[in-house]
């Protein structure tokens, strides 16, 4: 990786990792992986970084680092209360409250927005709950969503395993009624999740991220309309905006994290 980026090893000052699981960033350890990279919980990454590179190491949850990046240098720059929802294989979230990243007692606050339950009788999620946002509307569950949908044609269901959101949105744009139904139902679920985040965290702005935002011209107006109609916001509408840093958001978040660590500044609440 260093060679690919043409970085001299001698110039290396710190190693950072954005990890898709619950992370203790104080002790640089993975707490829980939800059946992904389970061996990570037993690895001393601090030790690995020092033994191999003789540099300090830092890490955090990938979605939390993404919101940190967008807050520091991206779509939420200048704001103090921010929620970011990243739509992809799963549903990731990160939260900034009063100018600090939200962690909670056990470092999981703000990170589990994909596992907020919207339908307690709904589809079983990988976390063990029923009807989580992720189980109802993520890319990982999309083939299952298609196969189990009672209103879709059998011809559409036959290709369930090859569907991703890019294809669903393209087919919907071309007028395919089955794809349009799935697309709109998923956007309704994302809107419902955002309404819940707004009620829980009272943000100034909500950021949407993930590769699916290549269709932001469809997603942002649709979700904004639903949220404006249904969210309880006496102080006014909460803007929903696309992320602007793309896949680099978490890298900017890591940079923010490293800078604050070197300055011995507190970054969390």
Regions from the language model: what does each represent?
Residues 77-136:
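Glycine-rich phosphate-binding loop of actin/hexokinase-like ATP-binding domains
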Residues 3-15, 21-81, 218-229, 233:
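Glycine-rich phosphate-binding loop and adjoining helix at the ATP-binding site
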Residues 20-23, 88-90, 212:
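Short glycine-rich anion-binding loops that position phosphate/pyrophosphate groups of nucleotides
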Residues 58-71, 213-269:
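Glycine-rich phosphate-binding/hydrolytic loop that grips phosphoryl groups
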Residues 133-207:
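A mobile "lid/hinge" subdomain adjacent to the ATP/sugar-phosphate binding pocket shared
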Residues 87, 139-140, 210-211:
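Short secondary-structure boundary segments
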Residues 2-6, 68-73, 184-198, 228, ...:
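Generic structural signal for well-ordered alpha-helical scaffold segments
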């Amino acid at each position: 990786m260093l060679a690919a980026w043409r970085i001299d090893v001698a110039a290396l000052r710190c190693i950072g990792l954005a990890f898709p699981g619950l992370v203790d960033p104080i002790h640089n350890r993975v707490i829980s992986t939800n059946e992904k990279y389970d061996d990570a919980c037993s690895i001393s990454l601090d030790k690995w970084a020092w033994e191999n590179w003789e540099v300090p190491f830092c890490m955090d949850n990938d979605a939390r680092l993404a919101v940190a990046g967008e807050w520091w240098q991206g779509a939420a720059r200048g704001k103090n209360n921010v929620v970011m929802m990243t739509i992809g294989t799963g549903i990731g979230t990160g939260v900034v409250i009063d100018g600090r990243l939200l962690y909670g007692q056990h470092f999981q606050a703000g990170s589990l927005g994909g596992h907020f339950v919207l339908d307690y009788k709904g589809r079983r999620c990988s976390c063990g709950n029923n009807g989580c946002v992720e189980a109802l509307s993520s890319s990982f569950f999309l083939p299952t969503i298609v196969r189990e949908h009672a209103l879709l044609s059998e011809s559409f269901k036959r290709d369930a395993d090859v569907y991703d959101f890019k294809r669903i949105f393209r087919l919907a744009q071309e007028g395919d009624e089955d794809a349009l139904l799935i697309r709109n139902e998923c956007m309704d679920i994302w809107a419902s999740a955002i309404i819940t985040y707004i009620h829980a965290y009272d943000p100034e702005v909500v950021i949407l991220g993930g590769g699916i935002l290549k269709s932001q011209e469809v997603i942002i107006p649709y979700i904004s309309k639903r949220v404006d109609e249904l969210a309880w916001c006496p102080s006014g509408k909460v803007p929903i905006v696309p992320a602007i840093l793309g896949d680099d958001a978490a890298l900017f978040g890591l940079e923010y994290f490293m800078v604050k660590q070197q300055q011995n500044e507190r970054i969390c609440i």
